Structures are given as structure tokens and as C-alpha cells.
UniProtKB/Swiss-Prot annotation:
One of its GO terms (molecular function) is protein dimerization activity. This is RILP-like protein 2. Gene3D superfamilies: 1.20.58.1770, 6.10.230.10. Residues 8-19 have a biased composition (Acidic residues). Residues 67-159 form a coiled coil. GO terms for biological process: cilium assembly; epithelial cell morphogenesis; protein transport from ciliary membrane to plasma membrane. The keyword Nucleotide-binding does not apply. Involved in cell shape and neuronal morphogenesis, positively regulating the establishment and maintenance of dendritic spines. Plays a role in cellular protein transport, including protein transport away from primary cilia. May function via activation of RAC1 and PAK1. The gene is RILPL2. Residues 125-197 form the RH2 domain. Belongs to the RILPL family.
Amino acid sequence: MEEPPLREEEEEEEEDEAGPEGALGKSPLQLTAEDVYDISYVMGRELMALGSDPRVTQLQFKIVRVLEMLETLVNEGNLTVEELRMERDNLRKEVEGLRREGSAAGPEVNLGPDKMVVDLTDPNRPRFTLQELRDVLQERNKLKSQLLVVQEELQCYKSGLIPPREGPGGRREKEALFPRGSNANSNKEEKTIIRKLFSFRSGKQT
């Protein structure tokens, strides 16, 4: 009964050993947001090797846009899978509860179409709704993305790609990390996670 979790752990270890290039060999249905970031790293590295031709720069913007769309599709797909798993577990518990009720002596319980039997003593009983699960997964993916960007910034500092600058409240340092025009306002869209990772990881190859 414990074999499936072990197999999943072995697969994760193999994926880690494969490195960023391993994401390109995955099935589209198995991709995660982290795989999309690995793909952005590989593509950025390949583009840097082509030089600074204007056509390469134009191609880079198109690739970034495609990766952003892929990230959105992957996140939505992962949420759908988690929702289906939760619904499957709920249905299993409902069937088990109906079987117990049917075999036990006593009056028959008539459940409605949107009702399910939950054993309050079961430590594995469902405790969250599908919407709550969706919110948690979205927050988790957002935090993972932010962590990746922070790690890339730290690596750039350590390697000297981004020299720290003195300024009140670290304002100049933020401008070095995320340059903006002097007339930029609050309505201007900031870089997405994909764009940040693409630029940081590409910069390492220079």
C-alpha cells in the first residue's frame, strides 16, 4: 500500500537530477510552475548564446509571452487536478459511509444529492471546501514564485552582477534590481515572475 508514495519520491529525485533541461522532456500534463521557470532558464541561456542581434531581442519578448501563457495554463491545470482528487476522496468516503449505514441495524438514512456522510472521528476526513483548496494552492504557487525571484536576486548579488548601491531606505538598490523610468506611475505593470527569472538567469551567462 505504501508503494505509490515511494514511487512519487523516486520520480521527484530523478527530476531533480535531470536539471532544468529535464522539464522539456516532461509530458505537458505533468508540468508544474517550477518546470515553466526551468524552461525559461534554458531558453534564456540559449538566446544569450546567439548574441545581441535585434532579431534575437524581438524573439526573446515573444518567448517570454508564450512562457507566461504556459505558466497560466499549468497553474489552472494543477488546480483542476487537485479539485478532482479532493472530489474523488469525498465520493469514496461517501460510499464507505453509505455501506456502513446499509450494513448497520437501524433506520435507513436518505441522503440528498449534495449530502455526504462524514465520520467525525476519522483523522483523514475532508476539512476544506474546493474553493478554500483553490485559494491555498494559488497562494502556495505565488509564494513559490516570489521565493524563486528572491533566490535569483541573492545569487546575482553574490556573483557581482548587481552591485549594491547606497541610498536612503535601500531605494537605489531596488532601482538597480527593477529599473523604471523617472516618470513611471503606479498604474504601470511590473515585471512578471517569468520576466524576472528570464532576465536574472540570462544575465548569469554573460
